[in-house]
């Protein structure tokens, strides 16, 4: 229990630091992606990133059955709950901060989910173009 509390404290402090400087793909303040389920590398609801975020979880995407199946086939099962990480499992319609590289893989395979541009971190542009994101923007 102590370890979990300490981990939450560290993540909270890292998230507060990341949030202070986070911008979206339009150079505007990053907006909330989703609070239910709580998403983001820091589980703060935002697609914030930092040096500890190896996967670069910066693209706010709306889950689809097609994408959930695609990512599971790549070894990342997002649909099955994992109580150890307090992860509820995702279903179509949920929003989640995806790894930029995984979203690009899905894009290349015609399986990319729609994205909330205002909630997608500017760091995503290191991996995909703004045109690719706009093509999959939630209208």
Residue ranges and their predicted role:
Residues 17-139:
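A charge-rich, low-complexity, intrinsically flexible signal that marks solvent-exposed coils, linkers
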Residues 2-15:
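Short, positively charged and aromatic/hydrophobic N-terminal segments
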């Amino acid at each position: 229990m102590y370890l979990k509390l300490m981990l939450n404290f560290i993540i909270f402090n890292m998230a507060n630091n990341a949030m202070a400087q986070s911008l979206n793909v339009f150079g505007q303040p990053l907006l909330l992606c989703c609070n239910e389920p709580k998403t983001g590398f820091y589980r703060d609801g935002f697609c914030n990133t930092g040096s500890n975020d190896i996967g670069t979880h910066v693209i706010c995407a709306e889950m689809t059955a097609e994408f959930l199946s695609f990512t599971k086939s790549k070894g990342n099962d997002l649909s099955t709950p994992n109580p150890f990480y307090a992860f509820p499992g995702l279903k179509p319609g949920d929003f989640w901060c995806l790894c930029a590289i995984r979203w690009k893989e899905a894009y290349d395979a015609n399986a990319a989910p729609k994205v909330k541009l205002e909630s997608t971190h500017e760091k995503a542009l290191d991996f995909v173009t703004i045109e690719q994101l706009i093509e999959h923007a939630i209208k």
